[in-house]
């Protein structure tokens, strides 16, 4: 039978506890032993140990927050039974823990390669952290020694050998956590629609690139982030798949970086204006393409020189410009009967297939003559060529010597009203691709179809504007003069919507003609894709007038650069070359360049190599025309006169050819010199290397 020898084995208030305590006090040493706790448990649970002191000490352990409370009388383990003697022996040599003068405000536990911060606690006990290797119990104890109250003291942690372990306890001041500011925590939100194949990681990468480029020209970081987010959203909305998204974002990034120059590098505005004059439309081209001209008799009127198709005989009958159906209208222009309009918004395109060519609509791939794939509430008409009143004409302006008339790109958007197409938006871009004027316009008549698929104008855009067509005309007349170059694609439709008469225009539809010729025209979208590598007019929200105007301007700049590359460069000739452009050998039979365009190289051969094979062959056929070079401006060395060497450097070469020993052939008397025939009948000349 085991005998209880420690007071802690009995429950609080048990009678035997006092008796055991008295027996233990007699066997205890004369000096008190401090409390000791092993530092490391080597993976095994080790309970708290308390050495016996001279006075009775009652220690109660507080239960942990996690898990149930531990019963004080749990049975001993093998490790505990073997570990007690060793701990008692080492505890006798340990000094007492120092007393703290003030209450610790924070505790930080430092471990090898790891630091962990302990939270503040309002409890009077010391708060320690729990690691993966061991658990430290939180305990509070009170001890009275020599009639004074002893404060709670944290004990030093030691290992088995009596040395301090690597885990130390440091008491520091109150730690202030630095938190980032609110603007840095705000991140752009990328919205994602269902069914899209563009990864979000790819979108974030290009959004970051857009932001970096926008920071170079935006006033603030917030403005740059908003602009970059809008650019990425536009590219994402018009991209059904990943490949299309990559094409759009690359074009957008190229535009933001400014890789596509807005004007010719190193070329002034006046020089650019002079270069664009060769691409202007002539009077015949203006009439052929339907540009308005001032009416000779009626002020404010316009006249068109294109053949107009004959409409229905009844003045109240109109023809729908979308489906081709005839419908009746009232005096106000409204439809008499409510009829649905079934139409195809795409064009008819012919493609090559096995066995021939097939014509299909680009919108739904249906055959011509099929029922339309789109439905509108009523029929509409164009009507711009029916009302030719209210036109204004640009006038000449006096400019200073350093000024030039100006170069602008123009694009307009229109909606269907009761009287046909009317202006709802106008955008003007200068030669630097900067938007100088952009506004929505309120039509004079009631809108029946906003045509948002192509115009990009909505009901909300028109509702918030009060600008009318006469106000727009006044502003444009202040910008333009009669000499100002206006650039656009099918610009006659824009001028008819603006009711503006201007003849100094550059039309990209004429500058880049269709391979079938007039009246076929290539679309601006195809031209931008073929020549600029850009995808435009691909948004579901409709066209953007500023985007179309910039595309027209870039196409014209591309044409100017191409013309500058293929144009021959005129090099200035040296004085020696101008004095003697064609060096010749002295000969009595040679014909001077002034009397004949024949090359002196051939005449030099005849004088110096008369006995040669070639000289003999030429003399045997006196009716054969003498060869001349392709370009009469070229000299004997095959170069232009400005690049020919001097006469002294060419004469030794001719002399060396003339001193070669002739072949043994019979001599033939030389033919008398004759006049050189027309240069067009001359064959290709022989080279000196032959």
From Swiss-Prot:
Residues 605-614 have a biased composition (Basic and acidic residues). Residues 136-162, 567-690 are annotated as: Disordered. Keywords: Cytoplasm, Exonuclease, Hydrolase, Nuclease, Nucleus. Residues 661-682 have a biased composition (Pro residues). The keyword Cytoplasm applies. Pfam families: EloA-BP1. Residues 612-626 are annotated as: GOR14-1 epitope. Coiled coil: none annotated. It comes from the Eukaryota. GO terms for cellular component: cytoplasm; nucleus. Its EC number is 3.1.-.-. Residues 585-595 have a biased composition (Polar residues). It is found in: Cytoplasm; Nucleus. May encode GOR14-1, a host antigenic epitope specifically expressed in response to non-A non-B hepatitis virus infection. Belongs to the REXO1/REXO3 family. This is Exonuclease GOR.
């Amino acid at each position: 039978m085991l005998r209880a020898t420690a007071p802690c084995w009995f429950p609080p208030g048990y009678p035997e506890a006092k008796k055991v305590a008295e027996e233990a006090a007699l066997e205890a040493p004369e000096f008190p032993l401090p409390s000791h706790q092993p530092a490391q448990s080597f993976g095994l649970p080790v309970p708290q140990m308390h050495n016996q002191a001279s006075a009775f000490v009652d220690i109660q352990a507080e239960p942990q927050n996690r898990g149930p409370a531990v019963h004080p009388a749990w049975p001993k383990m093998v490790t505990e039974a073997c570990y007690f003697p060793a701990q008692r022996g080492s505890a006798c040599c340990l000094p007492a823990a120092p007393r703290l003068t003030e209450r610790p405000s924070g505790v930080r536990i430092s471990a090898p390669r790891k630091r962990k911060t302990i939270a503040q606690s309002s409890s009077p006990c010391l708060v320690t952290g729990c690691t993966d290797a061991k658990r430290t119990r939180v305990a509070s104890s009170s001890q009275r020694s020599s009639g004074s109250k002893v404060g709670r003291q944290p004990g030093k942690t030691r290992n088995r050998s009596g040395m301090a372990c690597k885990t130390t306890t440091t008491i520091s001041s109150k730690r202030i956590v630095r938190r980032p500011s609110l603007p840095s925590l705000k991140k752009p939100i990328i919205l994602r629609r269902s069914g899209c194949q563009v990864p979000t990681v790819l979108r974030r990468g290009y959004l970051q690139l857009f932001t970096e480029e926008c920071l170079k020209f935006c006033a603030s970081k917030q403005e740059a982030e908003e602009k970059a987010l809008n650019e990425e959203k536009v590219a994402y909305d018009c991209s059904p798949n990943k490949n299309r998204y990559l094409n759009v974002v690359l074009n957008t990034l190229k535009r933001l970086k400014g890789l596509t120059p807005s004007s010719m590098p190193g070329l002034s505005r006046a020089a650019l204006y002079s270069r664009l004059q060769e691409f202007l439309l002539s009077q015949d081209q203006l009439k052929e393409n339907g540009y308005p001209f001032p009416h000779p008799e009626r002020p404010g009127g316009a006249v068109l020189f294109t053949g107009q198709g004959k409409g229905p005989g009844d003045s109240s009958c109109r023809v729908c410009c979308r489906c081709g159906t005839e419908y009746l209208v009232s005096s106000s222009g409204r439809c008499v009967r409510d009829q649905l309009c079934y139409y195809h918004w795409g064009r008819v395109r012919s493609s090559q297939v096995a066995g021939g060519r097939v014509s299909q609509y680009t919108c739904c791939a249906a055959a011509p003559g099929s029922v339309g794939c789109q439905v509108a509430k009523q029929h509409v008409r164009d009507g711009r060529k029916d009302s030719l009143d209210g036109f204004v004409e640009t006038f000449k302006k006096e400019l200073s010597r350093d000024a030039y008339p100006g170069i602008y790109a123009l694009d307009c958007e229109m909606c269907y009203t009761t009287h046909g197409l009317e202006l709802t938006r106008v955008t003007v871009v200068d030669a630097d691709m900067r938007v100088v004027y952009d506004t929505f316009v309120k039509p004079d008549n009631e809108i029946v179809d906003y045509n948002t698929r192509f115009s990009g104008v909505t009901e909300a855009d028109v509702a918030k504007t009060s600008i009318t067509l006469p106000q727009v005309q006044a502003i444009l007349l202040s910008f333009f003069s009669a000499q100002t170059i206006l650039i656009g694609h099918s610009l006659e439709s824009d001028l008819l919507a603006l009711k503006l008469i201007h003849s100094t225009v550059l039309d990209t539809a004429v500058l880049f003609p269709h391979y079938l010729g007039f009246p076929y025209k290539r679309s601006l979208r195809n031209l931008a894709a073929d020549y600029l590598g850009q995808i435009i007019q691909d948004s579901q929200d409709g066209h953007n007038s500023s985007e179309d105007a910039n595309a027209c301007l870039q196409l014209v700049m591309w044409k100017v650069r191409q013309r500058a590359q293929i144009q021959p460069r005129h090099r200035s000739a040296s004085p020696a070359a101008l004095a003697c452009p064609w060096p010749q050998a002295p000969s009595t039979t040679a014909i001077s360049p002034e009397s004949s365009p024949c090359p002196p190289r051939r005449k030099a051969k005849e004088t110096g190599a008369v006995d040669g094979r070639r000289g003999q062959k030429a003399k045997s056929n006196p009716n054969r025309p003498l060869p001349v070079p392709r370009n009469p401006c070229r000299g004997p060395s095959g170069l232009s006169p400005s690049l020919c060497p001097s006469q002294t450097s060419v004469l030794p070469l001719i002399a060396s050819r003339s001193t070669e020993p002739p072949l043994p052939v019979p001599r033939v008397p030389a033919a008398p010199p004759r006049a050189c025939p027309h240069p067009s009948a001359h064959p290709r000349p022989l080279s000196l290397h032959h």
